[in-house]
């Protein structure tokens, strides 16, 4: 950004934009979004942000946007990790799932309906839940056991659709 702006130095804003571009994807400002979709996206992202704020193990929110990205997201809520943790706890992973689903819940509470906007959130929440059970032995019902490596189990953990 600095070079494009003709500057020989970088600013904090340049670093922020680069961080977001690498982590989320470039903003796609050319995409025309209706006011209704902007409102849905804003409430969806607010649902995530509220949970980042109130759940004890979640990182603080770094930035929120309702501008679509080149990677297909209608918006995003990006936390800023406070630590570089090597391990995740079961409680933290459950809070991650809760936060991922917060956007979908906000849509339902505010609009009385849901959209397809949470599809990636649901995919990520499912991946976390599956790993908790199949890799980390975090299921209260199934106990301390790992179910196959990389989906090589025939009857457990395969996608049915």
What residue spans do the PLM features occupy?
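C-terminal helical "lid" subdomain and adjoining coupling/linker elements of P-loop NTPases
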Residues: 2-15, 21-40, 136-144
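Soluble catalytic regions of large protease machineries
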Residues: 39-43, 49-161
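Short secondary-structure boundary segments
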Residues: 2-17, 76-86, 90
